[in-house]
Each structure stands twice: as structure tokens, then as C-alpha cells.
């Protein structure tokens, strides 16, 4: 091989490596955008104007809460409640707890989904920590609120007839240390 072809190969490999690093940092925001646009993976609806339903449903639904943390993020993250029982149209406030176990300030972001996936279109979030990146100072512990309701149309959808339990799951990922 000539020096010119070795140089071209080196630049090509360097460019490929840089592209992979950039893509790894952009993957969570790109995934969130993809899910919001397509409704993929049980993505919920974000209420842009807080319209609180005055009409409440009659079918009791259990909402279970799940929390996961990427191994690269030294946080402890748990739901404060394991489950709640609600009816469609009932506004509900729950909390997750996050603690930064490191000696550094860290910014994290979360992705979420609802299972079963087909119930995601009826899960409406009014307020959620997942709408923004979260900064936790070194050794800081915080409560993170989520306010939501299940849309009343849930009861009228024949596909939801056998749904008794819905799981809201969050996964936190590290953005950067400060």
C-alpha cells in the first residue's frame, strides 16, 4: 500500500469512529423523538394544555411503576409507590426518587414507555420529570413528580377490555458530568 492510501484509510477510520461517538451521544434524544412522532413502544401523550377531566370512568385500573438506570449512571432511582389503583379521568400524582451516588454533579435524561404498548395512547402525562434533563448535585437525593391520567376513551375501546394493569417504566441515562 502506498502512503497516500494509508493516509486515506486512516482518515476514513477516524471519521467513522467520530461518527459512532457522536451517534452514541445522540441516540437517546433521537429515540425519544422517534417514539413521540410514531407513537412507538407505548409512548404516552403529553398534555400541552392542562385539561382536567371532570368525568371519571368506572373501570378500575392498576398502574404499576418501574425504574431502571443505565450502568454508566451512578444513580439510585426507584418509584416511591409500587402501584396505584385509579379509574379513567382521575388525575394522579406519584413520585420517583433519584439519588446521585457519586461525588460529581451529573445530568441525566430519562426515556419512558407504557406496557401494554396499545394502552400508551390513553396514558396522558400532565407533568413529568421526563420532559426535561435532570441535574443532580453530588450525593443529592430528590423526589421527581409525575402527574397523569388515563383518558376516558380507554373504557370505550374494545381492545382495552381485558387490560387490568398498565406499567409505566422509566430508564435513566447519563448525559454528562459537570
Curated annotation (Swiss-Prot):
Listed GO CC annotations: plasma membrane
UniProt gene name: ctaG
Protein localization: Cell inner membrane
Family, similarity comment: Belongs to the COX11/CtaG family.
NCBIfam families, sorted: PRK05089.1
Keyword Transmembrane assigned: yes
Residues in the Cytoplasmic compartment per record: 1-10
Purpose of the protein: Exerts its effect at some terminal stage of cytochrome c oxidase synthesis, probably by being involved in the insertion of the copper B into subunit I.
One of the record's GO molecular function terms: copper ion binding
Gene3D superfamilies: Ctag/Cox11
Residues making up the signal peptide according to the UniProt record: none
Identification of the protein by name: Cytochrome c oxidase assembly protein CtaG
Record organism: Rickettsia prowazekii (strain Madrid E)
Membrane spanning stretches: 11-35
Pfam family, one: CtaG_Cox11
Swiss-Prot/TrEMBL GO biological process terms: respiratory chain complex IV assembly
Phylogenetic lineage: Bacteria, Pseudomonadati, Pseudomonadota, Alphaproteobacteria, Rickettsiales
Keywords attached to this entry: Cell inner membrane, Cell membrane, Copper, Membrane, Signal-anchor, Transmembrane, Transmembrane helix
Membrane association type: Single-pass type II membrane protein
InterPro entries to which the protein is assigned, alphabetical: CtaG/Cox11_dom_sf, Cyt_c_oxidase_assmbl_CtaG
Topological domains, Periplasmic: 36-178
Superkingdom field: Bacteria
HAMAP family, sorted: CtaG
Keyword Lyase: no
Amino acid at each position: 500500500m502506498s502512503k497516500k492510501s494509508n493516509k486515506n484509510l486512516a482518515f476514513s477510520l477516524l471519521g467513522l469512529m467520530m461518527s459512532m461517538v457522536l451517534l452514541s451521544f445522540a441516540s437517546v434524544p433521537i429515540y425519544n423523538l422517534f417514539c413521540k412522532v410514531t407513537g412507538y413502544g407505548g409512548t404516552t401523550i403529553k398534555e400541552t394544555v392542562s385539561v382536567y377531566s371532570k368525568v371519571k370512568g368506572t373501570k378500575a385500573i392498576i398502574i404499576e411503576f418501574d425504574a431502571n438506570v443505565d450502568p454508566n449512571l451512578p444513580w439510585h432511582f426507584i418509584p416511591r409507590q409500587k402501584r396505584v389503583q385509579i379509574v379513567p379521568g382521575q388525575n394522579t400524582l406519584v413520585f420517583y426518587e433519584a439519588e446521585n451516588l457519586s461525588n460529581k454533579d451529573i445530568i441525566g435524561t430519562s426515556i419512558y414507555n407504557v406496557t401494554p404498548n396499545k394502552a400508551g395512547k390513553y396514558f396522558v402525562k400532565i407533568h413529568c420529570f421526563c420532559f426535561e434533563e435532570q441535574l443532580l448535585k453530588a450525593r443529592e437525593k430528590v423526589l421527581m413528580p409525575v402527574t397523569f391520567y388515563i383518558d376516558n376513551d380507554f373504557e370505550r375501546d374494545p381492545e382495552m377490555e381485558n387490560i387490568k394493569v398498565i406499567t409505566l417504566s422509566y430508564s435513566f441515562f447519563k448525559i454528562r458530568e459537570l
